[in-house]
Amino acid sequence: MSRNRQIIIPDDVMETEAVVNTVAGVDCFVSLPRQLLHALQSTSSSPLPPLLPVELRSGDRRWSVAWSGSSSSSSAIEIARVFAESISLPDGTVVKVRVLPNVPKATLVTVEPETEDDWEVLELNAELAEAAILSQVRILHETMKFPLWLHDRTVIRFSVVSTFPSKGVVQLVPGTEVAVAPKRRDRNLKAKKSQEKECNNVKALLRVQETDRSAFHEADVKGFELRVALTSIAYIHPETAKKHSLESLQLISVSPRIPLKGSAKKDEALNMKNSEASKVAENGTSSAKKEPRQAILRLVFSDLAAKGHLMMVESLRLYLGAGLHSWVYLRGCNVNEDKEIPALSLSPCVFKISENEKVLDKGTDRLGNNNSVRKSSHPPSGLSTYVDVVDWSVHDKVVTALSSEGLHDEGNHDKNKKGLEYLTRLWSLAQLDAMASVTGVDVSSLIVGRETFFHFEVRGLESYKSIDGQPSVNDRWESGKKDKHTPLEILYVMTVSDESLLGDKFAGYDLSLDRSEKSDNVVHIEPVLEKMNLGEPIYLKSAKETHCNKGVSPDISSLTWMGPIVSDVIKRMTVLLSPAAGMWFSKFKIPSPGHILIYGPPGSGKTILARAAAKYFEEQKDLLAHVILVSCSTLALEKVQHIHHVLSSVIAEGLEHAPSVIILDDLDSIISSSSDTEGTQASVGVTMLTKFLTDVIDDYGEYRNSSCGIGPLAFVASVQSLEQIPQTLSSSGRFDFHVQLAAPATSERGAILKHEIQKRLLDCSEDILLNLAAKCEGYDAYDLEILVDRAVHAAIGRHLPLESNISKYNLVKEDFTRAMHDFVPVAMRDITKSASEGGRLGWEDVGGVTDIKNAIKEMIELPSKFPKIFAKSPLRLRSNVLLYGPPGCGKTHIVGAAAAACSLRFISVKGPELLNKYIGASEQAVRDIFSKAAAAAPCILFFDEFDSIAPKRGHDNTGVTDRVVNQFLTELDGVEVLTGVFVFAATSRPDLLDPALLRPGRLDRLLLCDFPSPPERLEILTVLSRKLLMADDIDLEPIALMTEGFSGADLQALLSDAQLAAVHEYLNREDKPETGTTPIITDPLLKSIASKTKPSVSETEKQKLYDIYSQFLDSRKSSREAKGKRATLA
């Protein structure tokens, strides 16, 4: 795609004369002679653009045309014969040629077919016409006529009704909205052509804005509450009205913008919109017309309306099929003032959502709640997929309640008609009062169209039964007094039965009203009510508004623990969504900035941050961004074609409702760059989706800078890590604004806890929160939310039975203590707790190795006890240890005991567990285990049998261990310090390890776990014998002297053999002791077993190990000495 270039022609260039020749052609472009092209090129400092607006002038007549790059075969200007006839340019005309500078790009162009035949041909070839218009026509102005070729032979002629901007010549660009006014065959001979032209003229194209509760009017009704929706009023900002020459209380017709099916990216969404616009008429039979609904409204000025927006009540939006933040046309309207009052019908109605063939649900939108279900054996015809029908008895209930307050004269009206008449009075009174209260002008008439929409909210109705006498399914409304916050909503449509209005789409009828008894709030509309009848129920097909639910999205102000991250995201989204920023990028040819990628571990708050930022711009009056949340994890198991369809629809919706924020939550669940799937079908799908998203973002950036009509979009994606998505997606200009959310620190955890407690309207002291935050190391935002819920459950149990006189409940330390009992954070579900593993109690569980215990205590306990002192230390602490020594000398045991003694979490990894046959999988396993340790900090990360995964590089034929060693080096002394993570490794062959791992900053502290000496063996035997039943006279010191060369594991095996021998001795005794006694290890028995047991490591093997350790230490010493010598060439 190429950007549009601007050509700069000096103003003093003289006009060139040329002759116009008409030729056979199938577009509305001209071919210029080569001499003229050379002259234009010589006056420009850059190459000619692909599209050049040109003005041809002959005397007082002017024609605006476009050149698209072709040159004529002669010295004359060549133009298609049909196009020349349309613009009345005779063949052979001598014209002066001038380039039109700075032609504005059109946002909206309204055209009309010249004849009814043209309109009918267009209806049959709508998609073909839209695809062809940009390739055939690029320059237009009001009143201009032009042809359009279909299949290179069929010609449709149009005339331009209006353009926006409306002054002078405009050019069509990708994104320009082309509205086609229908040209139907004249069935109403009395219709006035001038009025029809005025009606079809689009006065404005505005974006729909949500209203507040002021869009309802309180009605004076006894016995219950009744609120009337202002469905005959639309609110507009005064500056917007002035811009479009609109006046207060002006009568306008509003209809949704439903563009033709256009670009490939919009196809699916626009197809769905067109189907949503179709109406289901009375008795459920589908209407033959596919035109959008329209409503006749009065304009009221309000500063609450944003500029460029139109505020309408939600039910009216659903009736029109105009979703929130969509676009609507404002047109003129004809009013029949002198006609006789026609017959009117008032029909109850309900919305049917075309998105999922279900009536609108309360949880998604406020209308069409549970009163839309009834047990019925007669579903409406034409809706075979619609099983349950509206309980129309709800409408009857309200009408019956109102009948007692209706007309007080003695007539033939039944209760239903009285109630309907009074309901119509209330609706009329509410509309008039609202207009008068805002504008200060008393309006004496209401204008109704062919269909007028009524919407009422009722509260406080007594319980009722359904028609068949069974309890109603509307349980939440069975007692309105019990739930004052849940309104009962009823809808009606008033239809004008006037055949003369059928040919006039934008016609309205003037209902003159008499409010002489204003003090009594009475509106006299008897002439209208006399001709009103109760119509059949109507099912209105509508579009479900898919905007993000504000109720579950947090505010930016509540994310205090995220600090500057929030402000950075807001700044980038401001640049992406601001129209002023887009103008600067386009003006100075600056590429559009990239979009936002939030990454971090699960539960770190990625979704919360994205939703809060989106909500901020959704509520910002200058933008009112449309928010779309796509949970990609729910699409993970779907086929690629379905995911492509969903993403296409979402992007089309975002473009249609721009400015928009599109949140792609858990994007890595559908687009992941895993080496395991390389070459598989899943990999092909990932490639397709990646290419689709990159193409969309690139194309959007190009169109955004070069064309108008494309509104601003901001993509926000969340993933767990940058490595999990393809680099092409996170490169410059795409998702290049990376935001990392790490595990929260103590202060951040305290802020999260405070926010969660306040969100539940509870209290807790600051001291408790600070102490709790310090204990919740490794907890993320999700874990803390669950913890608060558990504390609330504990508090409820403490307060039971609930005391009604307490206005606000407090959480105390006891509640959180109970909540933390047996609670394991998500990141630590497979991690050993700080309590001992395998029965370890702490340092008292370790015998001997005093020097090693002291070294580990110094490394682990001191920073924990005095964190402020060590925080001021400018040097990096030595927190990595290599334990080496003969087998069975307690290397693994002492690390586990250290974790228990220091209350640290313990992550133990056996070396071979990390190795994987797939390329890159072993390195990924190393990265994952270090990430898990960082999330679980403070903790000990222990690698047993370290020599099996980190041998010297260059000795592995496969190269797997070489890459693992490289990854270890990166993790151990990377740029990011592993705060709170103590890395321990154990091996019996340190000489096999790669020397780079033992250098300073890595595993630079070496501790030898040697065979225990006699005093150490005595300590080990004492510790191991605590849980054994031994005779009182047993002496362990001789045993310690007898077991020379035994390791700690050998001593444990010795005691196990002694215990087993005691059992056999007990069973072999002839005089069995009493039942319940246990075998006892005696001193002779223990000495006997010790004299028979041999150490597991022979003297030869021991000497071999000592030689290896000596050579290992000598090699390290010689390498350090070599570093101190200066190399010379002497």
From Swiss-Prot:
Reaction(s) this enzyme catalyzes, per UniProt: ATP + H2O = ADP + phosphate + H(+)
EC number: 3.6.4.-
Subunit structure: Interacts with PEX6; forming the PEX1-PEX6 AAA ATPase complex, which is composed of a heterohexamer formed by a trimer of PEX1-PEX6 dimers.
Function per UniProt: Component of the PEX1-PEX6 AAA ATPase complex, a protein dislocase complex that mediates the ATP-dependent extraction of the PEX5 receptor from peroxisomal membranes, an essential step for PEX5 recycling. Specifically recognizes PEX5 monoubiquitinated at 'Cys-11', and pulls it out of the peroxisome lumen through the PEX2-PEX10-PEX12 retrotranslocation channel. Extraction by the PEX1-PEX6 AAA ATPase complex is accompanied by unfolding of the TPR repeats and release of bound cargo from PEX5.
Subcellular location(s) per record: Cytoplasm, Cytosol; Peroxisome membrane
CDD domains for the chain: AAA, RecA-like_PEX1_r2
Keywords: ATP-binding, Cytoplasm, Hydrolase, Membrane, Nucleotide-binding, Peroxisome, Peroxisome biogenesis, Protein transport, Repeat, Transport
The protein, known as: Peroxisomal ATPase PEX1
Lineage, uppermost ranks: Eukaryota, Viridiplantae, Streptophyta, Embryophyta, Tracheophyta
Organism the protein comes from: Arabidopsis thaliana (Mouse-ear cress)
Family: Belongs to the AAA ATPase family.
